[in-house]
């Protein structure tokens, strides 16, 4: 699995958004400039999130720890 510096997944509106490098959830945005393709349910390398996870609000995790 690629490290977060290569590819990270950020939760937003129940979607999963792949970002090429850089920080994702820290800034409260799904993706940095560039790739904005969203697919699948909300999840990322750090945690498994419940439905309704958004970076702008609280992120309820069912496993692990979100930085959102």
From Swiss-Prot:
Annotated transmembrane regions: none
GO molecular function: metal ion binding
Superkingdom field: Eukaryota
InterPro entries registered for this protein in UniProt: Metalthion_4_echinoid/annelid, Metalthion_4_echinoidea, Metalthion_dom_sf
Keywords: Metal-binding, Metal-thiolate cluster
This protein's record includes keyword Oxidoreductase: no
Pfam families the record matches: Metallothio_6
Described function: Metallothioneins have a high content of cysteine residues that bind various heavy metals.
Protein family according to the UniProt entry: Belongs to the metallothionein superfamily. Type 4 family.
Name of protein: Metallothionein
Species annotation: Lytechinus pictus
Gene: MT1
């Amino acid at each position: 699995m690629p490290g977060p510096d290569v590819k990270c997944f950020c939760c937003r509106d129940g979607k999963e958004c792949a970002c090429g490098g850089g920080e994702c959830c820290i800034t409260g945005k799904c993706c940095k400039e560039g790739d904005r393709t969203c697919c699948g349910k909300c999840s990322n390398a750090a945690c498994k999130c419940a439905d309704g996870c958004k970076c702008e609000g609280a992120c309820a995790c069912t496993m692990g720890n979100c930085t959102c």
